[in-house]
Structures are given as C-alpha cells and as structure tokens.
Amino acid sequence: MKPTVPFLALALLVQTASAENWPNWRGPNQDGSSSETGLPAKFSTKEGVKWTTDLPGIAASVPVIWGDNIFITAPLKDQKKLVGLCYDKASGKEKWRTTISEADEVQWDDKSNLASPSAATDGERVYFLFANAVAAACDFSGKIIWKRDFKETHGAFATQWTYGSSPTIDSDKLYIQVLQRNETFQFQGKFNKGTEGKDMSSYVLAIDPATGKDIWKHIRPSLAAVESLEAFSSPVFTTYKDQRLMLISGGDTLTIHEAATGKEISRVATWNPPGDGYNKFFRLVPSPVVGDGIAIVCAPKNSPVFALPLDAKGETQPIWQTEPKGVTSDVPTPAFYKGKFYVLDGGKKLLSCLEPKTGKVIWTGELGGKTKFESSPTVADDKVYCVNFWGEVYVAKANSDQFELLSVNEMGNGSKPNGNADSVRASISVSDSSLFIRTQDKLFRVGK
C-alpha cells in the first residue's frame, strides 16, 4: 500500500525530532557534547562519507545545525564579502548565501579571518556576527531581518588578534561578548582597533533577537591590562538551583552572572595578579565549561585549569587547580561528557580526562601527529573527536578509565598549514548520527 501524505509528513516529523540540533558553536549543551549515538570511529574522505560539498572560504566557525539546515560563515576573499550560508543536511547542497558585510578586507592577520565567530540559531532565525562588528539576523530562507554595525553604537572591537567570540542565544536574548583593550590602538600599522570617543570598557550586550535592538549592556570590569584584557571566548549559560547563569572568561578571571540582567554574582580570584611579575600578554581563548555544578576555565599559555563552584558569591578562590606545567589548554575549549571534563592541550597534543569535583586527573594520553590542535574537542557516543591544523581527526575513547586512541582519520586537502589562516580550526559538529567536519575547503557529513 502506498504511504499517504499525512503518513509521510508524520514520518518526516518523527525523523527530524529525533535528531539533536547543534545550535551554537559548542552544541546543544554548550559543553561540546551530544547525546547522538551510532557515530563512526574510523573514516576518511572516501570512507563513511554521506556527502561532501565545496566551501567558498575557510573559517574557524563551526557548522551550526537546526533541523534540515546547516549554517556557516565564510569570507569571500576575492569579492571582499562576508557571507552567511545555509546547506541542506540531507544532501549537502547549498540552499542560499547571504552577504552580510562588504568589507575592505576579510582578513586582518595571518592567523584567521573576519568570519571566525560561529553562527547561532533559535530555530526561528539564524544570527551571524563578524569580527568587523557587523551582525545580522536572517530567516531560514536567507532574508535579512535586521542588520547592525556595532561600530556605530559601541565602537570597533579592540582586540589585537582578530575577534572570534561567537554570539549565543539564551531564552529570549541574543548575547554578544566583547572583552577588549581599554584604549584604541593600531595593529600592524594598518588596522585601527577600537573607536575614538567610544567607551572602550569590556562588556556583554543583550539584544532582542527579533529586532536587533539593545536590551542592556553590562560593563564587565577587570584588573587586567594591555593584551590580557582581550578574550576570544564566548558566553556560556547553565541553570543551577533554579537560577539561570551566564559565565564569562577573560581579563584574567572567570565571572558568573545573572543571565537575565548581566549582574555579576561571583568571580574567581585572578590567576594573573597585578604587580611585579604581571603578564600583560595573557589574552584568553578558551570558553568556560560547566559540569556537575562546577565551572572550569583554562588560564593562558600553559597555565593551570581553575575550577569555581556555581554557587560561589563574590570573589572566590578556586576550589581546585591543576598542577603547574600539568593539564592545560591555551586555545581549545574543554568538553564535558558523562560526568567528566576532557581537556585538550593543543600544543603538546595531549588529551586529559578530569574529575569535576576534585580536579583529579583520571588519565592523560598523547594524540600524536606533527601539527597543533586549535579546534575544541567534541564528545559523543563515548568518543572524543579532535581535529588538527591539517584536518586530521583523532578519535579517542571517552567514558573510560584509561586513555585509548581509536583512530586517526585524514580529512584535509593534503596541504600542511602550520598555524596560518589556512589551518583547520573549526570544531566538529554532531547531529542525526553524523559528524559534520569543516576542513580547509570542504564540508563533510560522515556517518549515517
């Protein structure tokens, strides 16, 4: 008997509902994890690939997924455009591309470009933000609903290296984090950072997703100075004891806020105190991660990992920190999965598993390879997925008492960049029992 139209519609609805979305750069739980199962441990550009599509430009932004849609940002270098794109999840075909900004330059330094921030979606609209401070909301057909240039109202972002914080949707607000220097400066004698006459304080901005208008602006004070004021992390949200919280890392500290108002509740005592020995080059990259009532933050440049309880009040000493020259992460954001933190030291190529309450290191294992990791680990189906500059995906066992490397999978285009803007920095996204892997010039769907 032929299926009826209502039956087919119901089947499609059930299939769509069963697939977990990846609505922002760190996924459905904002911790790099997914509950999806049936994910592959071994694959290549020719093995286990459901589809491959060419991308118009490389960026550190991850594939953001909602239903049948995959959203990414990209620079069009020759056309000097910054675009938002949508691909069909089932086929990989491009549905639309929308120009958000036409810029004089799409790249300001040799490490990244202006499309580094990932998109975010609430299932109704998709939100794009670029490092030149231009943001827009589009509907799912690619039509721009609103567009703003934050330079006009809040000034250009004043970070030495290209701004990379991703927008985050939580409840009824769109959040933009700008942790920046407190004065204007010029980078490489060419690019002006910050805007004269504007307040150069670091801040978090809450925006109405429907209109793009400011709801509130929270100034986020810090004792940091010079480059240590800068952060490339993104806001993280969690609920603890019936209170919705926002976590911000950077400026030599981790702070916890009321999500609804931005009011600061607590902060970890600084890892970089003012005075003799102060390091003014401690820019921060990793975002905070939450698990089992504990928030962790990775201090910069081989410094320890620090932990703060979510119920802390005021300035609080960390409840634990890793040993000096021990577990650390300068760039990748850790993940949380099934009661454990997973911390990737991208420079030394070491993956560690930590117990949240005590910081006990359960295991540390060497991934290997000949180049660094600056993408963040993704954990799902009892596997940890880490991708390096060359597009090599290392798969390790998660939810295990000991380190076990399961496979190394070549997904790059054969080039061997070593930290320049052509290096793979996008973390892996997960949905519908598949991995979505962005490399130098392609997007892969690997799995079912």
Placement of each model-derived feature along the sequence:
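N-terminal secretory signal peptides that target proteins for export/translocation
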Residues: 1-2
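Bacterial N-terminal signal peptides
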Residues: 5-15
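Noncatalytic, solvent-exposed loop/strand surfaces
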Residues: 18-448
